[in-house]
Regions:
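Nucleotide-sugar donor-binding/catalytic module of glycosyltransferases
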Residues: 1-169
C-alpha cells in the first residue's frame, strides 16, 4: 500500500541527451504516489526546457519551475521551498484548455528569479481549481540528478526503509 507521498526534485541544466531516460525512470516507477518537481536552471541547450514541458503536460504529478541559472543547489532549494509552501503562485492562465500547460508567476519574494511555474491542465478539474491551488503534502523528499535514472522498483523497495529519515540524497 502506497501511503507515503514522496517528493522528487530534479534539477535540470543542459541535459537534453539524458533527460528523457531520467524522467521515464521516475514516472514509470511501480511506486506511484509521487510529487515530481522539475527545476530548469537556466538551460541554454536547445531542448532541455522543451522536454521538461512535454513531460509536465502529460503527467499531472509534475510541476516545472523555469528559473535563472544559479547552480544545482539553488535548483534543489526551489524544490524544498515549494514543498514547504514558501511560494505564493498567481496563475497567468485564466482558463483551462485541454492539452495545455497552466502557467503561474511567483508573487512576492522570489530570490531564485523563477520566471514561470508550469503545471498540466490534467491537474485541475475546473477554473476554480486554478485559484485554490494547494501545495502537496509530502512525507519524504528525494533529489535525483537529471543525468541519472532509477531502476524500475527503486522507490517501492526504498520507502519501507525510510522511517526516521527526512531527506534522501
Amino acid at each position: 500500500m502506497q501511503t507515503k507521498t514522496i517528493g522528487v526534485v530534479i534539477p535540470i541544466y543542459n541535459v537534453e541527451k539524458y533527460l528523457k531516460e531520467c524522467l521515464d525512470s521516475v514516472i514509470n516507477q511501480t511506486y506511484t504516489n509521487l510529487e515530481i518537481i522539475l527545476v530548469n536552471d537556466g538551460s541554454t541547450d536547445e531542448n532541455s526546457l522543451n522536454i521538461a514541458k512535454e513531460y509536465t503536460l502529460k503527467d499531472k504529478r509534475i510541476t516545472l519551475f523555469d528559473k535563472k541559472n544559479g547552480g544545482q543547489s539553488t535548483a534543489r532549494n526551489v524544490g524544498i521551498e515549494y514543498f514547504s509552501g514558501e511560494y505564493k503562485l498567481k496563475n497567468k492562465t485564466q482558463t483551462i484548455k485541454e492539452n495545455s500547460l497552466i502557467e503561474f508567476n511567483i508573487e512576492g519574494n522570489n530570490p531564485y528569479e523563477i520566471y514561470t511555474v508550469y503545471k498540466s491542465y490534467k491537474a485541475f478539474n475546473n477554473e476554480q481549481d486554478l485559484t485554490s491551488f494547494t501545495y502537496p503534502i509530502i512525507d519524504y523528499i528525494i533529489f535525483l540528478d537529471s543525468d541519472d535514472y532509477w531502476e524500475l522498483n527503486c522507490i517501492e523497495e526504498c520507502v519501507p526503509r525510510m522511517d526516521g529519515v527526512d531527506v534522501v540524497w
